[in-house]
Structures are given as structure tokens and as C-alpha cells.
Design a protein with these regions (language model features):
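Solvent-exposed loop/turn segments at secondary-structure junctions
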Residues: 148-150, 222-225, 296-298, 337-341, ...
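Extracellular S/T/G-rich loop segment that most often corresponds to the catalytic His/Ser-adjacent loop
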Residues: 220, 243, 385-493
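Autoinhibitory propeptides
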Residues: 3-24, 29-59, 63-76, 80-191, ...
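Substrate-binding/access-modulating region of protease and related hydrolase catalytic domains
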Residues: 295-396, 465-482, 517-519
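Active-site core segment of subtilase-fold serine proteases
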Residues: 161-170, 175, 179-184, 188-287, ...
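Loop/turn elements at helix/coil->beta-strand transitions in domains of secreted/extracellular proteins
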Residues: 138-140, 212-215, 285-288, 327-331, ...
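C-terminal subdomain of the subtilisin-like protease fold in secreted/lumenal serine endopeptidases
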Residues: 323-337, 398-402, 493-525
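A cross-family glycoside hydrolase active-site/sugar-binding cleft signature
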Residues: 145, 293, 333-337, 367-370, ...
Length: 525
């Protein structure tokens, strides 16, 4: 394929996009500098003939390269391009050697060569490498290391990175002008985070089970303590050699101020995976949950770190599929995403799609949130769900397809904040959800009024960040995705009833068939 052919159908210019295909506001400079990230601005970025790009955010000094037969050539072209800009290309993380199954690509780092000043910009190096590759044999499997963000509705998106984890309209009326119907989802009483009382009993798990339990890997933050989550949470899981799963060091502060300004507020994503796990427990109490921490307490995920944990999940699933010890993995729940600079071209250079496809080829159903920017612009990985005109147009023949999930209001209508279009092939409740919160959380907010009454009892107005009661409210496609993932697990259990339950070990072909049937029962492609 010629490089001119690759860009022969450029993305539609802004003036001709369909209604709702808007670019969300980009993160502020303070967030970019924290992660050595750059904003790709279409008005300023270098482009090739016929190429149109859209805003995105990426790590300035890193590149991702797919682990395939093109790797040596891609590495050499990138090295030449880097040298032309006074930079040196370093293999920060080379492709995994040996026969062990892996989906991890290479992470390449750029740094100034010798003692010369140089501007480090991965986008320029990729574009130069594409030009060096020429029209006859274009550069394949090379991409930016994007900055990604988790996707609930939070009231302070600039404390966490607006707009990817929650767009600006959630906490202020901009850009809609005046009062915003979207902003209310972040307010207490409208679906925003606040403590609540519940009188429901703890979900009951069958014991013993007929067959093994389905396992849902929650790729998110650290799961924290709650009475509902003290069984069926697979902690201490390691890979051969003792390799720890995920980044458990991304631990939030229970009393606030772990990240962001010194304002005493809870880290905006401190409770994220705990809330998600509670939703899964409510929908499918018989499933086990494997926490895979990769989201920082401020909601930021670096794509290369996500690929690292996806590789760990893949290796766990592959080990189990060959009869080795360790947990099976049936479903992956991902409440995060990013906007690709060239959405029509993303499957061509995406290391992430290759990783998610390989999981699907093991029979793992990958479920991703559609995003909260009230746009039809594709958010990835949710937009890898099969759809006409997208990077994946049909369900892959030998894999479980990826599902992107949008959020519904309590009355079944689409939540005003939810992305739709290419990112949403399925829908699930995601607004004004009630779930588990870490019981240790009590940060800097205080009741607006408090007193000791004549009987000696303490009286208070609502204490909006005291979650010692263990439950809270939240909104976002972040919460629709795990609800749908739990429904997939339930479908796996239902379909296995006639055959004595989910088998402890099975062929990959059987696992793929089970996964496709479970997803197919819930999504009509």
C-alpha cells in the first residue's frame, strides 16, 4: 500500500463534520508539563500530503512500535528520522524475547544526541520517518504514546485532566453557555459524587459453584477496602517469576491532597475501581474480580503503561488456556480512553488494537467506556468496536469483538454526557449510579452546619466527602462499562448451566465460541 493511498480518504474538515462530531477541550498546560506531554494541534502540526489530523495528547519523548516483522525496519527509519533532528532513539523497552506469549510492543525513547540542544517531539520524528519510508512501502505499526484518561463524571476536571476523564461542561456551563444540562450530572443530587445510605443486603454468592467462576479483570485504579469486596477479589496474583500485576504503587490518599492543588479534596479518581467493583458485584455476585491497577489517582493513564498491563493480562489468560495454574480471564473492563489524531487510520498504526485483538483471540471479551464528552468523535479503545466506516468494520472471525458502552439515565434514555456514534455499540445504566466507596475516605470538606443537641447527640448537615458509610453516587460511562461487563459474565454463566458450568480448562476455540455467544446475546452487530 502506498503512503498516498493511506491518506487518500482524509478525515473530514471541521466545517463539514456531522452534527455532534466535536473536539473536546484539551488538558491545560499544567497537566501536560506534569507528564512531559504535548498537545497535537492540527493548525500547527506537520502533516503529509492528503493527511488531516485532529487534536490529541501524547508523551513528547516516547514512541510505540508493534512487535511484528516490520519492527527492525521501523526502528531503523525512526532512528534515521531522530538523527535528522539531533536526537537519539533508545529502546526503553524492547520487544519481549523468547517463546512466552506476549502482546507487548516496544517503547522507544527520544533524547538529545550528544551535547546539542534539540526539540524533543515524537510527532515530528514519526512524520519524518513516514517520509523516509516513501510511498511504496509505508511505515507500519508505529504510533504515539498517548495520554489517556479515565471516564466518570467528576466535578473538577481541571484537577484531573479535562476533558478526557470528564469534559468541562460537567463542572461549569462552558461550552454550552449559561446553565448546562450536562453540568448537573456532577452536582450532588443530580448524579454527582456524594455519600448515600442504602438498606439493601450484601449480594449473595453461590457457594459452592457449579463449574468455575467467571473472572472480570478491572483495569483501573487500586481497589480499596469495603465489606462487600472482601471475598471474590483476586489479590496477590503474580506471573511466573513473581511479576506483580499492574501498578499497585498508584495508591490514592484517603484524606485528600494526593494529587492536585492543596485544597483538602479527595483525589478525583481515588475511589474509581472500588465503585466499579461494587457495580460488578451487584450485577453478577458469582463472578470474581481481578484488580489490575494502572490509573493514577488523578485519572491519568499513559498508553505504554496500559499496554504493559494488557500484556500481563494476556499472559495470565494464555497460561490458563494451556492448563497452567492461575486465574482464567473471561472479561476485561476498561473505563478509560483517548482521542486518536487520525481515527480513520488508527488500526494501521495502533499497538493497542493489536493487543486487544490478541485478547479476543483467547476468548476474552473486552468492554470499554464510550467517553463523557457528549460527542460522536470516536474515543479509543471503545471505537474499536465493529462499525461501518470505522477501523474495524466487522467482528473478527476468530476473536471476541470489542464492545464500546455508552451510558443511560435511570429512565432508560441516553445520558446527556455520554459519547455515542462509533464509540457505543451497547448501552448500560451509567447515570446516578449507587455503589461501594472506600470506608476509610474522609477528606477536607466539612458539614456546612454541625452542633451537639440538648440530648448530647451530634447533628450535621450532609458531609459530602465522608464515605465511612461505604456507599456513594456517581455518573459516567466509566460505570456503564463494568455494568455491561458484568452482564457478559452473567451470560457466560447462563449459557454454561446446561453443560455443568464454566469448565476449569478448555480449548481456546471453545473459549472464543463462548465469548462470542455471550457478547452476541447482548449486542446486535
Amino acid at each position: 500500500m502506498q503512503s498516498s493511498e493511506r491518506f487518500s480518504e482524509p478525515s473530514v474538515p471541521a466545517s463539514k463534520r456531522r452534527l455532534g462530531d466535536d473536539d473536546p477541550l484539551m488538558p491545560p498546560a499544567s497537566l501536560l508539563s506534569k507528564f512531559n506531554a504535548r498537545l497535537l494541534n492540527p493548525a500547527e502540526a506537520a502533516t503529509l500530503p492528503g493527511q488531516r489530523i485532529r487534536p490529541s495528547v501524547y508523551i513528547a519523548d516516547r514512541l510505540l512500535v508493534r512487535p511484528n516483522g516490520h519492527y527492525p525496519r521501523s526502528r531503523d527509519l525512526l532512528g534515521q528520522a531522530a538523527a535528522g533532528r539531533g536526537l537519539r532513539l533508545v529502546e526503553e523497552l524492547p520487544p519481549r524475547d523468547g517463546d512466552a506469549p506476549s502482546i507487548r510492543g516496544a517503547v522507544m525513547r527520544l533524547e538529545p544526541d550528544d551535547f546539542r540542544p534539540a526539540q524533543v517531539d515524537a510527532w515530528w520524528v514519526i512524520q519524518d520517518a513516514r517520509a523516509l519510508a516513501g510511498r511504496e512501502e509505508p511505515l507500519v505499526g508505529v504510533g504515539l504514546d498517548h495520554l489517556m484518561f479515565a471516564t466518570p463524571v467528576v466535578a473538577n476536571p481541571y484537577n484531573s485532566p479535562n476533558p478526557y476523564n470528564s469534559p468541562n461542561p460537567y463542572n461549569s456551563p462552558n461550552p454550552f453557555g449559561g446553565w448546562s444540562p450536562i453540568a448537573q450530572y456532577a452536582e450532588p443530587g443530580g448524579g454527582g459524587t456524594q455519600p448515600v445510605n442504602i438498606v439493601l443486603p450484601k449480594p449473595v454468592r453461590q457457594d459452592p459453584m457449579c463449574g468455575r467462576r467467571p473472572v472480570i479483570a478491572v483495569i483501573d485504579t487500586v481497589v480499596l477496602d469495603h465489606p462487600w469486596l472482601r471475598e471474590g477479589i483476586l489479590t496477590g496474583v503474580t506471573l511466573p517469576g513473581g511479576e506483580i500485576i499492574g501498578f499497585p504503587e498508584f495508591m490514592p490518599a484517603p484524606d485528600g491532597d494526593g494529587v492536585g492543588p492543596l485544597d483538602g479534596l479527595l483525589d478525583p479518581f481515588a475511589f474509581h475501581a472500588t465503585f466499579i467493583s461494587g457495580l460488578i458485584r451487584q450485577v453478577t455476585p458469582d463472578a470474581d474480580i481481578l484488580p489490575v491497577p494502572v490509573v493514577r489517582p488523578d485519572g491519568v493513564i499513559i498508553e505504554s503503561e496500559l499496554l504493559h498491563v494488557l500484556d500481563q493480562v494476556y499472559r495470565l489468560a494464555a497460561l490458563h488456556s494451556t492448563g497452567n495454574a492461575g486465574p482464567a480471564i473471561d472479561v476485561v473492563s476498561m473505563s478509560m480512553g483517548y482521542y486518536h489524531e487520525s481515527p480513520a487510520d488508527v488500526a494501521f498504526d495502533s499497538v493497542m488494537y493489536e493487543a486487544l485483538l490478541k485478547l479476543g483471540e483467547l476468548g476474552v471479551a473486552v468492554v470499554a467506556s464510550a467517553g463523557n464528552d457528549a460527542t460522536v468523535r470516536p474515543m479509543f479503545p471503545a471505537a474499536f468496536t465493529p462499525h461501518a466506516g470505522g477501523p474495524v468494520t466487522q467482528p473478527p472471525p476468530n476473536a471476541v469483538p470489542i464492545v464500546g458502552v455508552g451510558a443511560l439515565n435511570p429512565n432508560g434514555t441516553v445520558a446527556m454526557f455520554s459519547n455515542s456514534g462509533p464509540s457505543a455499540s451497547a448501552w448500560a445504566p451509567g447515570a446516578a449510579m449507587v455503589s461501594t466507596m472506600p470506608i476509610t475516605f474522609n477528606a477536607g470538606l466539612n458539614p456546612t452546619s454541625a452542633m451537639i443537641d440538648p440530648s448530647g447527640q451530634r447533628r450535621e448537615s450532609p458531609h459530602l466527602d465522608d464515605f465511612s458509610g461505604g456507599f456513594g453516587v456517581g455518573s459516567g460511562t466509566s460505570y456503564a462499562a463494568p455494568v455491561f461487563a458484568a452482564k457478559v459474565a452473567n451470560e457466560l454463566l447462563t449459557q454454561a448451566q446446561s453443560s455443568g458450568g464454566i469448565p476449569e480448562h478448555e480449548s481456546v476455540e471453545h473459549a472464543v465460541t463462548r465469548g462470542r455467544h455471550a457478547v452476541g446475546a447482548l449486542v446486535k452487530w
